């Protein structure tokens, strides 16, 4: 499992968290939760594949070659959708906010979970849980105005979080992902 960490980092996945793979597959106890911050965006722009679902295909093109034959990848954009948020909380990657966004202790809400890789092996030792998100007044106000079907209110919720503001996605990345939401597609 640990042999994959440098390759995933080199591919642009700057969030990789070990977890107990039994959460997805009892026969594959070693797991890696794979995510990224805005650092992956320039790589996507340089490689942007033509055709439908370019970001999802880009993610797969980076991860698939790194996965051993005896491992399984559960992508966040493919059905059945894996419980990536639950895995993030259980593994100690972040805490769940009242909005159901996972809040990373450094990046805040400005990261994305892409895949869970499970393989034979020993699970990692239990990780300490991240302290629960404590919404201050800006977060409470944004939460009170949150409309589940309005992408602008979701963006306002992320912007209200004081954690990780310096890791906010660039405007073109926000536009790309929230344009998908406006069209009714899953956002990655």
Language model region names:
Residues 1-64:
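Non-catalytic, usually N-terminal nucleic-acid engagement modules in DNA/RNA processing proteins
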Residues 31-32, 39-42, 51-188:
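Catalytic cores of enzyme domains
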């Amino acid at each position: 499992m640990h042999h994959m960490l440098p390759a995933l980092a080199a591919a642009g996945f700057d969030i990789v968290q070990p977890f107990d793979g039994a959460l997805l597959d009892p026969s594959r106890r070693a797991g890696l939760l794979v995510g990224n911050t805005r650092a992956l965006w320039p790589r996507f722009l340089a490689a942007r594949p033509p055709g439908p679902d370019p970001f999802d295909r880009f993610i797969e093109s980076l991860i698939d070659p790194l996965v051993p034959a005896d491992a399984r990848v559960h992508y966040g954009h493919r059905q059945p959708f894996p419980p990536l948020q639950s895995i993030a909380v259980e593994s100690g990657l972040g805490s769940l906010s009242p909005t159901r966004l996972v809040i990373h202790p450094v990046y805040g809400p400005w990261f994305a979970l892409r895949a869970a890789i499970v393989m034979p092996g020993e699970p990692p030792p239990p990780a300490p849980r991240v302290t629960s998100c404590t919404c201050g007044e800006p977060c409470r106000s944004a939460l009170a105005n949150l409309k589940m079907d309005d992408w602008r209110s979701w963006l306002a919720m992320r912007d209200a979080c004081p954690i990780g503001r310096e890791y906010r996605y660039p405007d073109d990345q926000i536009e790309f992902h929230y344009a998908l939401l406006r069209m009714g597609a899953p956002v990655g």
